[in-house]
Amino acid sequence: MSTITKDQILEGVAALSVMEIVELISAMEEKFGVSAAAVAAGPAAAAEAVEEQTEFNVVLASFGDNKVAVIKAVRGATGLGLKEAKDLVESAPAVLKEGVNKDEAESLKKSLEEAGAAVEIK
């Protein structure tokens, strides 16, 4: 039995047509019990996990003991009228602002927590 080198294999594959390469890949998948598609999907999933979140939602979890102060803080932050702000606060948990940057979300959270609200950033 003669030994085939990697270079000889590469030259042989380079001489194949696209259809022949597809058939070769299928035969290799069957022979070795692997799937080429599963290997290709791995790095893409890892790249998505690395992305940092840039837009946040500020959620009023509860208004705590001082509902009036929280309503005032919500009005100041959102520009809503008194009735709309009151309805929003009373419907907690509720999204106050969507798609804001991290600094704005942190600032809004701080001002609402100072008024007595429980706030989450998602």
UniProtKB/Swiss-Prot annotation:
Pfam families per the UniProt record, alphabetical: Ribosomal_L12, Ribosomal_L12_N
Gene3D superfamilies linked: 3.30.1390.10, Single helix bin
Gene Ontology MF annotations: mRNA binding; structural constituent of ribosome
InterPro entries: Ribosomal_bL12, Ribosomal_bL12_C, Ribosomal_bL12_C/ClpS-like, Ribosomal_bL12_oligo, Ribosomal_bL12_oligo_N_sf
Keywords, comma-separated and alphabetical: Ribonucleoprotein, Ribosomal protein
GO CC annotations, alphabetized: cytosolic large ribosomal subunit
Keyword Ribonucleoprotein in annotation: yes
Disulfide cross-links: none
GO biological process: translation
CDD domains (UniProt xref): Ribosomal_L7_L12
The keyword Nucleotide-binding belongs to this UniProt entry's keyword annotation: no
Family statement drawn from the similarity comment of this UniProt entry: Belongs to the bacterial ribosomal protein bL12 family.
HAMAP family: Ribosomal_bL12
Subunit field text: Homodimer. Part of the ribosomal stalk of the 50S ribosomal subunit. Forms a multimeric L10(L12)X complex, where L10 forms an elongated spine to which 2 to 4 L12 dimers bind in a sequential fashion. Binds GTP-bound translation factors.
Task performed by this protein: Forms part of the ribosomal stalk which helps the ribosome interact with GTP-bound translation factors. Is thus essential for accurate translation.
Designated name of the protein: Large ribosomal subunit protein bL12
